[in-house]
Amino acid sequence: MFVSAHSVFPSADCFGYRGGVSDISNIVILTGAGISAESGLATFRGPDGLWEGHRVEDVCTPQALARDPVTVHRFYDARRAALVEVRANPAHEALARLDAAWTGELLIVTQNVDDLHERAGATRMLHMHGELLSGLCAACGERFRWDGPMLAAPEGPFAAPACSTCGAAAIRPDIVFFGEIPYQMDRIEQAIARADLFVSIGTSGAVYPAAGFVRTARHHGAATLELNLNPSEGSIFFGATRLGRASELVPAWVDEVLG
């Protein structure tokens, strides 16, 4: 379903305004949990406010890691293992197709910590909230590819993995916890400032700083478009909104963009 959300762009096309491909050169796309939900990955917060049965405060804060590292590591080990059971869906594949075909600037900024964009073939992208398949040394800042569990002995005394660079037993999930600064914010803000089109896909519009990107984009003159299952908390700020399943909306939108 297409919803012309506001009178700012009353006859919005696939670019979120009255215009066409000749007016668009630089695109920034923000993706959230909604794009991966159809692959079988739980959204960050379900209707009950929990993430896979846990309060976010118990598994996604620096305080939780310090207080109960076993629970935190067990949680992310389970999320990492779950990635093996899922695959990229048509929405990821469509964005990878756009990534490959678009001759202007394009940046996919994902709030997701899975690797489904990469598996689909996207290359012009970044993870602002970190990655499940990465480990971070809290002592020296080195990052490592990490495919398996970090919790070597789930039932015994906790011991963090040792860093091969500095030797400290300080490896933690490379996840941006609440209270920490998202990654590559300078690059994201610069890309949004140059964007002609900002598109948000499958996001709640509730988590900052990402929830503020649409207003930044509009401030710099970009057209704005939301693709979501339901209107987000920030829908009012978009020039146009399309509602439906990401696996249907995103391929259709990419087809329109690429002609």
Regions found by a protein language model. Give the residues of each.
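Extreme N-terminal basic, low-complexity initiation segments
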Residues: 1-8
